[in-house]
Curated annotation (Swiss-Prot):
Keywords linked to the UniProt accession: Cell inner membrane, Cell membrane, Chaperone, Membrane, Protein transport, Transmembrane, Transmembrane helix, Transport
Subunit structure, as described in the record: Interacts with the Sec translocase complex via SecD. Specifically interacts with transmembrane segments of nascent integral membrane proteins during membrane integration.
Major localization listed first in the record, in broad terms: membrane
Region span, Disordered: 38-75
Annotated GO biological process: protein insertion into membrane; protein transport
Gene: yidC
Gene source species: Sinorhizobium medicae (strain WSM419) (Ensifer medicae)
Name of the protein described by the UniProt record: Membrane protein insertase YidC
Residue stretches spanning the membrane: 8-28, 372-392, 446-466, 491-511, 535-555
Length: 597
C-alpha cells in the first residue's frame, strides 16, 4: 500500500509538472511571440510615408489596382472627418461610406459591446486605412487604355441619389470617365449585415470595352487576442469546386499568396471569432480568389477576387452585382443569407469543426431551448438531458455490464489469491472469467468515451457561436463563453491577490472535478495498479485542464457527470447490484499503510 501511495503522489506531481511545463514552454512563449509580432506591426504602421499606384492599374506585386498606403498617424475621428461620406444607419449598424473609392471603412455593430459592461463601447468592425486598426472593403474595376480611368481606390464618386443609407433608403453613386463610360452604383442594406452593391455600366464610347471587376477585404493588423487552434481566424472563403478555404495569417506572411484557382460561385473574406467581413462576387462570372500579405509600407492582409472580363458594346449597358457581409456571425442570420442569396456553403463562415454533423444540430437544439426558457445555461442543461436520453440504450447496456462485473467481484478476489504474484497467469484467468460471464472490462470507460464527440461538439458551440458571447447563467457566471472568474487561490476573491493563471481553479471546475471523482468511484477499482492510479488522479488532471475552459462547457460536464451517476445507480439497482459509491469512498479514505516489516 505504501508503494501505491507513492505512485499516487508521483502521478499528481507529474500532472502538475506537465501543466507547469505547458504554461512555461508553450503558452508563455506563444503569447510573447504574439506580443512581439504585434509590436513590430504597430511600429511598421507608425512609419511615415505612402506608396501610390495609378488608379485602375496594378501596383507592383499586386494583381489589383493599388491605392495610397498611408501611415497610421491619425485618430479614427480625424480620418473619418477629412473625407466626404454618406452615412449608414440601420438597426444593427452605424457608420459611413467613404466617397473616395466608395470604400466601406467606418462600421460599428450597435448590438454588441466590447465587454459585459453595458456601458462599454460598441464593437468597431471597420476603420479607415489611416488608423492603426485600418480594416475595410471595396469594389472596383480593372480597365485598359481603351476604357480610360475606371473606378478604383482613388476614384471620387458623386452622391447622386439619397443622403443616408438605411434599410428603406438606398443610395446611388455615379462616376463618368473621359471615354464616355458611366458607372452608376446603387447600394442597399438590410436590417442586419448584408449590403448589395449593384453597378450599372453604360458604354457611350465609340468602341466596345472590356473590364474586370474586383473586390477586396483589407486589414492592417491581426486580432490582438491570442489565436486558439480549435478555432480558425484569418482568411476564409468558398472557391467553387475547390471548396472551403481556411488560410491562417501566418500561412501567407512568409510564403506566396494562396490562390485556390479559377472558380464560379463562392465567396471570400476575413473572419474573427465572432465577426467577419466577406464579399460575394457575381456568381455567374468566373473569378480568381487570392489570400495574401503585403509588407510594402505598412504590412497588411488582403482577401480579394478578380473576375473574368466583361465586354460592353457601344451604346449598351452591363450590370455587376456584389454582396458584402460585414457584421456578427449570428447563426440564423448567416443561414438565412445562404438560402436567400444562394451563397454556396455560407454557413461555413462559422467554424463548426470536424463534428459539423453534431455541432450544428446541437446548436439548433440549444437555441430552441434558449428561446423557450430565455437562458443559455438552462438550455445547456436541458440539451444534456436530451443527449443522455438519446444515448440511453447504449449506456444502459454498458452500465449493466459494469453491474455484472460487480457480481463477479468475489470470483476475481479468489483468482488474485490463487495466482499470487503470477501476473501473466492472473491476466489470462481474468480474461477467461470475463468471457464466461460475458463482461467487457472496459465498460467503465465507455460512457466517458461515448460523450467525447458530443463534448467537442458542445465545446465548439459554446466557444465559436456569438449567441453564447456574454450570455449569463446565474450568480457570478455572467458570460458562459468565458472561464469561471472565481479562483480558489485567493479564496474566491476574499484575499487581495491573484495567483498564477495555470493554478486558477474556479467554483465550477472544482464542482466538475468532484462529480467526476464520484462517477469514477461508482465503478469497481481496476485490479491493475497502473489503471487504479489513473482512475484516482484523472479527475484531478481534468479539473486543472477545464479550469480555463468556457464556463458553459464546465457546467455541462459537471451536470453530465451528475446525470451519469444517477443513471448508473438506477441501472445497478435494477440489476440487483448494490451501489457501492459510499462504501468505495469510505474504503478509499480509511486505508492505512501496512506496518513496516
Amino acid at each position: 500500500m505504501m508503494e501505491n501511495n507513492r505512485n499516487y503522489f508521483v502521478a499528481i506531481a507529474l500532472s502538475v509538472l506537465i501543466l507547469i511545463a505547458w504554461q512555461f514552454f508553450y503558452v508563455s512563449p506563444k503569447m510573447e511571440k504574439d506580443r512581439i509580432a504585434a509590436e513590430k506591426a504597430q511600429q511598421a504602421q507608425s512609419q511615415p510615408g505612402t506608396q501610390q499606384a495609378a488608379p485602375g492599374q496594378a501596383a507592383p506585386g499586386q494583381a489589383l489596382p493599388g491605392g495610397a498606403i498611408p501611415s497610421a498617424a491619425e485618430s479614427r475621428d480625424q480620418a473619418i472627418g477629412k473625407s466626404a461620406r454618406v452615412a449608414i444607419d440601420t438597426p444593427a449598424l452605424s457608420g459611413s461610406i467613404n466617397l473616395t473609392g466608395a470604400r466601406f471603412d467606418d462600421l460599428k455593430l450597435k448590438g454588441y459591446r466590447e465587454t459585459v459592461d453595458p456601458k462599454s463601447p460598441v464593437i468597431t468592425l471597420f476603420s479607415p486605412a489611416e488608423t492603426a486598426d485600418g480594416y475595410f472593403t471595396e469594389i472596383g474595376y480593372i480597365g485598359s487604355d481603351a476604357t480610360g480611368s475606371v473606378p478604383g481606390p482613388q476614384t471620387v464618386w458623386m452622391l447622386s441619389g439619397g443622403d443616408k443609407l438605411t434599410p428603406s433608403t438606398p443610395v446611388t453613386l455615379s462616376y463618368t470617365n473621359d471615354k464616355g463610360i458611366t458607372f452608376t452604383r446603387t447600394i442597399s442594406v438590410d436590417d442586419r449585415y448584408m449590403f448589395e452593391v449593384v453597378d450599372s455600366i453604360k458604354n457611350d464610347a465609340a468602341a466596345a470595352v472590356s473590364l474586370s471587376s474586383y473586390g477586396r477585404v483589407t486589414r492592417f493588423n491581426k486580432p490582438s487576442t491570442p489565436s486558439i487552434y480549435v478555432l480558425h481566424e484569418g482568411f476564409v472563403g468558398v472557391a467553387g469546386e475547390h471548396g472551403l478555404q481556411e488560410v491562417g495569417y501566418s500561412d501567407v506572411e512568409d510564403e506566396e499568396p494562396v490562390e485556390p484557382g479559377k472558380s464560379t460561385g463562392g465567396w471570400l473574406g476575413i473572419t474573427d471569432k465572432y465577426w467577419a467581413a466577406t464579399i460575394v462576387p457575381p456568381q455567374d462570372t468566373p473569378f480568381d480568389i487570392r489570400f495574401s500579405h503585403f509588407a510594402d509600407g505598412r504590412p497588411r492582409y488582403q482577401s480579394d477576387y478578380k473576375s473574368d472580363a466583361v465586354t460592353v458594346a457601344p451604346g449598351q449597358s452591363a450590370e455587376v452585382k456584389n454582396l458584402i457581409f460585414a457584421g456578427a456571425k449570428e447563426v440564423p442570420v448567416v443561414d438565412n443569407y445562404e438560402l436567400t442569396y444562394s451563397i454556396p456553403n455560407f454557413d461555413k463562415l462559422i467554424d463548426w469543426g470536424w463534428f459539423y454533423f453534431i455541432t450544428k444540430p446541437m446548436f439548433k437544439m440549444m437555441d430552441f431551448f434558449f428561446r423557450l426558457f430565455g437562458n443559455f445555461g438552462i438550455a445547456i442543461l436541458i440539451t444534456t438531458i436530451v443527449v443522455k436520453l438519446i444515448f440511453f440504450p447504449l449506456a444502459n447496456k454498458q452500465y449493466a455490464s459494469m453491474a455484472n462485473m460487480k457480481k463477479v467481484q468475489p470470483k476475481m478476489e479468489e483468482l488474485k489469491k490463487k495466482f499470487g504474484d503470477d501476473r501473466m497467469g492472473l491476466q489470462q484467468a481474468m480474461m477467461q472469467l470475463y468471457k464466461e460471464e460475458k463482461i467487457n472490462p472496459l465498460a467503465g470507460c465507455w460512457p466517458i468515451l461515448i460523450q467525447i464527440p458530443v463534448f467537442f461538439a458542445l465545446y465548439k458551440v459554446i466557444y465559436v457561436t456569438i449567441e453564447m458571447r456574454h450570455a449569463p447563467f446565474f450568480g457570478w457566471i455572467q458570460d458562459l463563453s468565458a472561464p469561471d472568474p472565481t479562483t480558489i487561490i485567493n479564496l474566491f476573491g476574499l484575499l487581495p491577490f491573484e495567483g498564477p493563471a495555470f493554478l486558477h481553479l474556479g467554483i465550477w471546475p472544482i464542482v466538475m472535478g468532484v462529480t467526476m471523482f464520484l462517477q469514477m468511484r461508482m465503478n469497481p477499482t481496476p485490479p491493475d495498479p497502473t489503471q487504479a492510479m489513473l482512475f484516482t488522479w484523472m479527475p484531478v488532471v481534468f479539473t486543472f485542464m477545464l479550469a480555463s475552459f468556457p464556463a458553459g462547457l464546465v457546467i455541462y460536464w459537471a451536470w453530465n457527470n451528475t446525470l451519469s451517476i444517477l443513471q448508473q445507480g438506477i441501472i445497478m439497482k435494477r440489476q440487483g447490484v448494490k451501489v457501492e459509491l459510499f462504501d468505495n469512498l469510505k474504503s478509499l479514505f480509511s486505508k492505512k499503510p501496512k506496518p513496516a516489516e
